[in-house]
Structure formats: C-alpha cells, structure tokens
C-alpha cells in the first residue's frame, strides 16, 4: 500500500490551505503523520514549491507534478506511475483532513482483501437528517454487502420501496468521505476515461468510474472527520486541535 496526498496551493475559498497552521504544524504535516501511522510509504503530490519545501522541512517525501491535472486522482496517477508497481494499491488521502484516523485508512485498505474490489472509499452516518439536504455533503448509497450503488449531491434511493420515512433514508444514505484506494491498473485506466454525463452534471469524478463498470467497495466509519474547505473550517480545526492536545 502506498499513500499519496494530492496538495494544491490555489484554492478559491482558502488559498494555501495545505500550509495553514493548526497548532504548531502545517495542515499537510498533520495529514502526513497520520497517514504514515497506517501506511508503510506516504508521498505528497504537489505542483507548488512552497508546499514541497514545507514537506521537505518536516522530513516528508514529496514529488512535484504537472500543474494541469483536473483532479487529485490524476495527480495521484502521475506519482504512482513513477513509484508504484502493478501489484500495489494506491491510497489517495485528502490533504485537507488533518484529523483523519490511521484506523480509517486501515479500514480502507482492508477492502482490498476482496479480489473483486477495483476501488475503495469511506463513508460515515449522517449526524442529522437535515445534513442530507446540503449539496456539498456528498451522499453515497451503500448496499448491505458494502458495494456502492451510487453517489449524488441529493439524497439517493434505490427504487421506491420502503423509503418514505426519513429514518429509512438515513439508514441507506451515508456521508461520503473523499478517501480512495485503487489497484494500480485500475488507477491507470480510470484516469484515461472520458468524463461521463453523470460526472459532469454532479461534478463528481467517482460517477465516471461507476458508469464504466468499476466496482467500488465502501467501508463505513463511525463518524465524519473534519474537512477544511473554508476559513471557518480552519478555525474549527484549530479549536479541535487545542481541545485534543490539552
């Protein structure tokens, strides 16, 4: 298993967020340290020298990538081509999840004990029913055997039976957490696929993979993890870090 953390400096809502300080460390260092407790090899993939310099300064492994990638998956594929072998599983870890637990990453890896798993991801129960109506909280409908049925920005149902009650919706819809694992060959193939109509409509690259028949296994973790997208999220992360270090 090889962990790759795609990290961009330019973010519309929070520029330079991988270098945002949480306590006495930049966010990217928090992510690297947690990933390294779960995986034998972890790399940061970036197109920005400021991020590369910061990673080198704390002793992390970093690789410069093309600035032209559309997605973090594409950035991962560029690095994987240089460092991974055909039997490797690549774990794509979001650089804006400073408190991702090593246990969650290990659960993601465990999905590959099933030889039918092409891709794996994580999800958590929604804390509140009203959160299911928030578009940026991506929903994933997970079958009882752990296979993903679909992803959407709106609540999902499979057929119409037994989904009248909000409790039923909550039982089937989980909050998607954007970590992915891919078998090496799968990663090489999915990054060459043309964008699907469903992907373009929802701005969710994982819909391209489902549309092309790739099987995605989803591990359920007990609760969501903080994702830093806005200045408000960063303040929450700083406070959470304080609460957990005292």
Predicted regions mapped to residue ranges:
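Conserved core of the sugar-phosphate nucleotidyltransferase
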Residues: 100-193
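Conserved alpha/beta core of the MobA/IspD/sugar-nucleotide pyrophosphorylase nucleotidyltransferase superfamily
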Residues: 167-246
């Amino acid at each position: 298993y090889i962990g790759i953390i795609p990290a961009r400096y330019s973010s519309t809502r929070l520029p330079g967020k991988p270098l945002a300080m949480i306590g006495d460390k930049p966010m990217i260092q928090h992510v690297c340290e947690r990933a390294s407790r779960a995986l034998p090899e972890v790399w940061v993939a970036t197109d920005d020298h400021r991020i590369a310099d910061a990673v080198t300064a704390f002793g992390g492994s970093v690789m410069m990538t093309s600035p032209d990638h559309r997605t973090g998956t594409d950035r991962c594929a560029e690095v994987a081509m240089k460092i991974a072998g055909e039997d490797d599983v690549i774990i794509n870890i979001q650089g804006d999840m400073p408190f991702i637990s090593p246990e969650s990453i290990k659960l993601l890896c465990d999905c590959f004990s099933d030889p039918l798993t092409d891709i794996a991801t994580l999800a958590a129960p929604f804390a509140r029913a009203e959160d299911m109506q928030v578009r940026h909280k991506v929903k994933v409908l997970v079958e009882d055997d752990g296979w993903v049925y679909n992803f959407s920005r709106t609540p999902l149902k499979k057929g119409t039976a037994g989904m009248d009650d909000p409790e039923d919706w909550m039982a089937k819809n989980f909050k998607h957490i954007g970590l992915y694992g891919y078998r090496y060959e799968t990663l090489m193939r999915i990054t060459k696929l043309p964008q699907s109509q469903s992907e373009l409509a929802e701005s969710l690259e994982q819909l391209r993979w489902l549309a092309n028949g790739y099987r995605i296994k989803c591990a359920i973790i007990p609760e969501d993890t903080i994702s830093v997208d806005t200045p408000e999220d960063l303040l929450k992360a700083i406070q959470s870090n304080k609460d957990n270090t005292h």
